[in-house]
């Protein structure tokens, strides 16, 4: 948005770029947003935190919305007098950096720190009130040394163990793939068919905390979104059921096949059992039958992701083995099936085709028996999965679920063929990753001593940072200086662990490190943690509901038990912001997919309502399809560059728009044209302030010396001035309630716009320009700008300074109860229920006076020609006169 030099010097014009740079420089110079841990014990502290970003190198609108939300709340609570901590850091390890490094042939460390520099500069242009003195990146040894130290403490406690885990293996790149890197059963980079492979990995015993993680969700009710709480409950998945043992007679090593079921009432309907390819019975069968061995190998190929298995075709093979049904004594065939995972439960399931959809599908495919044991409606087709009355179950016929559960348990438990059991869907957290760009695991592998923890004195175990990975295997294995070491236990030659930590480790405790980020003597300073934790308001996407948020809750409990923090939960309140959406433009391509285009490359026509009607690609003049409104993404080319928008309209306009256009927890449909509304609003505020300054100067007065509006006797103000004072203090009260109680971030902007309109009306209609009316106008403007500074801090503080306000001492304005009292109220007058007039009356006017005044109104009197049957008065609202005929 270009301007000529004379315009730039004109105070009546709003030039956001100039004032925003000026205000940001002031904030940086006086370290406005830095907070000390040495503040008074009596100070009210508040910790506001948005989920820290991965340093991709460029902000997107999702970032802008996320950080603006937490910044508005931070600025509001500072106005309320709180000591507010709003820090920023970088979730800097992880696969994206490694992949980018491979593609660009650059060391991930160099790529990452360059991106951090770019994103920090972008964040600062948004005017965020961040304490940058606490900034850190998780890929620095100063941070991850404490992660390594904490791992060693957990290892000593027995909360860490090592076991074989089944992973996705790319045989060409010789590397482990995350589930999302498996595309149609093939490696995303090499295109090679993915295999399952067992490799040793370290695990955290998160299941030891399953009950506490589940039960403590009750403490978050009303403070976290209910859908997030539900997702965590389902993810932990506490199930009460029965473990049933099916005897196996043909092996000295295997006495029973153990299965867990939440539906023991269907036990009499079991017609086969299914086991994973890695189960001991499957291996036993594979040793005897090459075809079964071949099938088991087939099952080991493909993704190990639960979601992928759910979509995959269910296949199986009869092992020829049988187990004994614990109730009937009948022999039940054992099948190996691809839908059973060894990593879930015992790696075996009892199959009841009549009452389980997956078992029903499998049984029909392989012509296996289907036995109904729950009374089923006659017209029902397929598997009947509801609970009900038992049938075809011998002595258990006629029992309901609870009755059959107890009866079967009473019969089987004395024979050690069943036991009551609680099982969790939650599995222990595998924290090993076969990747380079991550925190090294502080363990040593000794041929004689096994797995040995590193001496704490040797921490941090530093990751070599000058490595340029090629995507084939873990490069750490090929660095002798890193790998070769001595065993801390026996002193002999040994090798360092080359796996690195899951990056969820870094993001599980970063919030606590912000309390004492520069402490090089301990992971978390307890006194500082007690001062700031728990986080008062956490802001982030709902997509983190069951990974990051669950692991952070787990980590907090671990740190609590280590004496590092207090309290049971890390985040007191959680706000999950909605996604930012935008329209898409595309053409179908010959490959059967879609080619998406940037909006800047397309000429779009609109109808009278502003709806797009036609889109033409500028490059060839041919039409493109106007697609759905979808989440902004690189793949859809529908993202909006925040910096471009800031350069055009200013950061204050972008901040206002992202919060005004939709409630914070709902999706925001981006529209470039809609930015003009907030931009014009800020220009209006600018003009009103300039008008006030000019009017004050014309009377030879100074804004700093105007009397306080509250000190002026109300009798000296006309109705226009009283109305402006009333609106001013109504807005003070409403915004305080919206932000402090309701956490409604869009409605305050509407209130600010209403107040600006009221000020504009006052300026245009006020005929008595004097010290008193200027004082009322001044109060309204200072209030408007103070509250506006929460959303649009640059223009807000800049104009406040013009009005003589010290912005370093800014506080939330106090509502004046006297100003809220109305001298008159407007009442509606109806005749036979139809509005015929209005009247201004004093509050509390008696009913008879109201009736008389209503009938005297000219527009009402002409309808009172018949007999008056009834006169209804609703105090302070309306008078309704009922007339005959």
Curated annotation (Swiss-Prot):
Keywords: Aminoacyl-tRNA synthetase, ATP-binding, Cytoplasm, Ligase, Nucleotide-binding, Protein biosynthesis. GO terms for molecular function: aminoacyl-tRNA deacylase activity; ATP binding; leucine-tRNA ligase activity. This is Leucine--tRNA ligase. GO terms for cellular component: cytosol. Belongs to the class-I aminoacyl-tRNA synthetase family. Its EC number is 6.1.1.4. GO terms for biological process: leucyl-tRNA aminoacylation. The lineage of its organism: Bacteria, Pseudomonadati, Pseudomonadota, Gammaproteobacteria, Moraxellales. Disulfide bonds: none annotated. It is an enzyme of class 6 (ligase). NCBIfam families: leuS_bact. ATP binds at residue 634. It is found in: Cytoplasm. A motif ('KMSKS' region) lies at residues 631-635. It comes from Psychrobacter sp. (strain PRwf-1). PANTHER family: LEUCINE--TRNA LIGASE, MITOCHONDRIAL (PTHR43740:SF2), LEUCYL-TRNA SYNTHETASE (PTHR43740). It catalyses: tRNA(Leu) + L-leucine + ATP = L-leucyl-tRNA(Leu) + AMP + diphosphate. A motif ('HIGH' region) lies at residues 53-63. Its main location: cytoplasm.
């Amino acid at each position: 948005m270009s301007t000529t030099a004379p315009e730039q010097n004109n105070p009546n014009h709003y030039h956001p770029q100039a004032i925003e740079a000026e205000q940001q420089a002031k904030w940086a110079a006086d370290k406005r947003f830095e907070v000390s841990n040495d503040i008074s014990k009596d100070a009210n502290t508040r910790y506001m935190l948005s989920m820290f970003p991965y340093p991709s190198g460029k902000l997107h609108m999702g970032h802008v919305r996320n950080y603006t939300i937490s910044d508005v709340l931070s600025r509001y609570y500072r106005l309320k007098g709180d000591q507010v901590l709003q820090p920023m850091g970088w979730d800097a390890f992880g696969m994206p950096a490694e992949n980018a490094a491979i593609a660009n042939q650059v060391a991930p460390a160099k790529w990452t720190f360059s991106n951090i520099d770019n994103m920090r500069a972008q964040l600062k242009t948004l005017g965020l009130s961040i304490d940058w003195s606490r900034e850190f990146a998780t890929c620095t040894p100063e941070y991850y040394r404490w992660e390594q130290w904490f791992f060693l403490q957990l290892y000593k406690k027995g909360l860490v163990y090592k076991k074989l885990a089944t992973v996705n293996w790319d045989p060409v790149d010789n590397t482990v793939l995350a589930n999302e890197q498996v595309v149609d059963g093939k490696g995303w980079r090499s295109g090679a068919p993915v295999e399952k492979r067992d490799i040793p990995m370290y695990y955290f015993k998160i299941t030891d905390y399953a009950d506490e993680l589940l039960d403590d969700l009750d403490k978050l009710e009303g403070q976290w979104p209910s859908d997030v709480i539900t997702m965590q409950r389902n993810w932990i998945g506490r199930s009460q059921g029965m473990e049933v043992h099916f005897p196996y007679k043909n092996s000295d090593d295997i006495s029973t096949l153990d299965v867990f079921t939440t539906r023991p009432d269907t036990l009499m309907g079991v017609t086969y059992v299914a086991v994973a390819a890695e189960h001991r019975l499957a291996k036993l069968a594979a040793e005897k039958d090459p075809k079964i061995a071949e099938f088991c190998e087939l099952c080991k190929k493909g993704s190990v992701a639960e979601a992928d298995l759910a979509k995959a075709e269910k296949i199986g093979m009869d092992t020829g083995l049988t187990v004994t049904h614990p109730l009937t004594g009948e022999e039940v065939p054992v099948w190996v099936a691809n839908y059973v995972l060894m990593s879930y439960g015992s790696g075996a399931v009892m199959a009841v085709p009549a009452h389980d959809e997956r078992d029903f599908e499998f049984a029909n495919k392989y012509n296996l028996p289907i036995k109904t044991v729950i009374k089923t409606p006659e017209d029902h087709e397929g598997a009947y999965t509801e609970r009900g009355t038992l049938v075809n179950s011998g002595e258990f016929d006629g029992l309901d679920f609870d009755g059959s559960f107890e009866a079967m348990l009473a019969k089987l438990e004395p024979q050690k063929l069943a036991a009551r059991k609680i099982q969790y869907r939650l599995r222990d957290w595998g924290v090993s990753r076969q990747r380079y760009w991550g925190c090294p695991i502080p363990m040593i592998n000794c041929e004689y001593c096994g797995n040995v923890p590193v001496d704490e004195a040797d921490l941090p175990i530093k990751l070599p940072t000058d490595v340029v990975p090629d995507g084939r295997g873990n490069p750490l294995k090929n660095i002798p200086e890193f790998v070769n070491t001595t065993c801390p236990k026996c002193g002999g030659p040994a090798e360092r662990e080359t796996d690195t930590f899951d990056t969820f480790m870094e993001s599980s405790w970063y919030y606590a490190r912000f309390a004492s980020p520069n402490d090089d003597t301990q992971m978390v300073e307890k006194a500082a943690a007690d001062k700031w934790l728990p986080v008062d308001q956490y802001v982030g996407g709902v997509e983190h509901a069951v990974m990051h948020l669950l692991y952070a809750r787990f980590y907090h409990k671990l740190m609590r038990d280590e004496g590092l923090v207090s309290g049971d939960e890390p985040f007191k309140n959680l706000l999950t912001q909605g996604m930012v959406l935008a329209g898409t433009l595309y053409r179908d391509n010959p490959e059967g997919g879609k080619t998406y285009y940037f909006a800047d490359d397309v000429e779009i026509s609109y109808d009278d309502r502003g709806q797009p009607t036609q889109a033409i690609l500028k490059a060839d003049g041919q039409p493109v399809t106007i697609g759905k409104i979808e989440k902004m993404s690189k793949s859809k080319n529908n993202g909006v560059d925040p910096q471009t928008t800031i350069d055009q309209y200013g950061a204050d306009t972008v901040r206002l728009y992202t919060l005004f256009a939709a409630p914070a927890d709902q999706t925001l449909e981006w529209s470039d044209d809609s930015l003009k509304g907030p931009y014009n609003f800020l220009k209006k505020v600018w003009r009103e302030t300039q008008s006030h300054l000019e009017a004050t100067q014309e009377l030879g007065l100074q804004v700093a010396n105007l009397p306080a509006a509250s000190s002026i006797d109300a009798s000296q103000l006309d109705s226009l001035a009283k109305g402006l004072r009333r609106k001013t203090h109504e807005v003070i009260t409403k915004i305080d309630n919206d932000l402090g109680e309701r956490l409604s971030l869009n409605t305050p902007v509407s209130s600010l716009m209403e107040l600006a309109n009221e000020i504009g009306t006052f300026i245009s209609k006020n005929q008595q320009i004097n010290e008193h009316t200027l004082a009322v106008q001044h109060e309204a403007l200072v209030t408007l700008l103070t509250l506006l500074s929460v959303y649009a801090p640059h223009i807000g503080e800049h104009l406040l300074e013009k009005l003589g306000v010290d912005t370093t001492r800014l506080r939330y304005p106090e509502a004046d109860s006297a100003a809220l009292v109305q001298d008159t109220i407007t009442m509606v007058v109806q005749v036979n229920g139809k509005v015929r007039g209005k009247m201004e009356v004093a509050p509390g006017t008696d009913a008879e006076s109201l009736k008389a005044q209503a009938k005297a109104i000219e527009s009402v009197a002409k309808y009172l020609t018949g007999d008056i049957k009834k006169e209804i008065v609703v105090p302070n609202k309306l008078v309704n006169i009922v007339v005959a005929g």
